[in-house]
Structures are given as structure tokens and as C-alpha cells.
């Protein structure tokens, strides 16, 4: 299977990357099948060979997560909703709903306790008068 991935080059702590097409079993910095672009994370400079990338994607090449993000920014592929994002949002929504239910329950209990307390002194006053 062909992967679109980043190949690291540059000095220590000053890495730059080439966007390459390579076999999925090859090493990260091994010989690529084709160089498709360039990415410098320090300056955010990105150069993409759009025709070659579209051709590789048409042949079934799979981009890695970082490369997918770069291609989305470049407008070559549509943004995708990643499952982890939707799962995280679902968990947050469920947590908010549970907190709201608990707050409503606590408020109802406090209101019932206040009503019971208000009735208790009235009952004591009637008993002492009678």
C-alpha cells in the first residue's frame, strides 16, 4: 500500500519535512517513490505539487494524519470528521447533560426540604395552641 507521509530532513531542532509517496513498509527517511511537496513547521511554509498528489490519491494512496491536515489546509481533500473528535464531543455532551440533571435534582430536593421545614413550624404552632 502506498502512503503519503512526511520525510524529515534538516539540522537538529530545525527540522523540515518533504511530503513523499512511499511504500507503507519502508522506513520514514528511506527512499521515496515520489516527492510531492515540502513543509516547514517553523515558518509554516507549505509547497504542494497538487497534480501529483491528486494522481496518487486517485491511485489509492493513504495520507497519514499530519499529511491529511496539510492537504485539507491546501484544499486538496475535504475536511473529515475524525471519530475521536466526535467521541470526545459526545462524552462532553453527556457529561453536561448529567450535570444539568443532577443540578435539577438537587434543586428539587432543596425545594422539598424547604417546604417540609416551613410546614413543620406551622404544625408545632398549632399543637402548642391546642
Swiss-Prot record:
Residues 98-130 are annotated as: Disordered. InterPro entries: Ribosomal_bS16 (IPR000307), Ribosomal_bS16_CS (IPR020592), Ribosomal_bS16_dom_sf (IPR023803). GO terms for molecular function: structural constituent of ribosome. Keywords: Ribonucleoprotein, Ribosomal protein. Residues 98-109 have a biased composition (Basic and acidic residues). Pfam families: Ribosomal_S16 (PF00886). One of its GO terms (biological process) is translation. Transmembrane segments: none annotated. One of its GO terms (cellular component) is small ribosomal subunit. Residues 110-130 have a biased composition (Low complexity). The keyword Ribosomal protein applies. The keyword Endoplasmic reticulum does not apply. Belongs to the bacterial ribosomal protein bS16 family. This is Small ribosomal subunit protein bS16. The gene is rpsP.
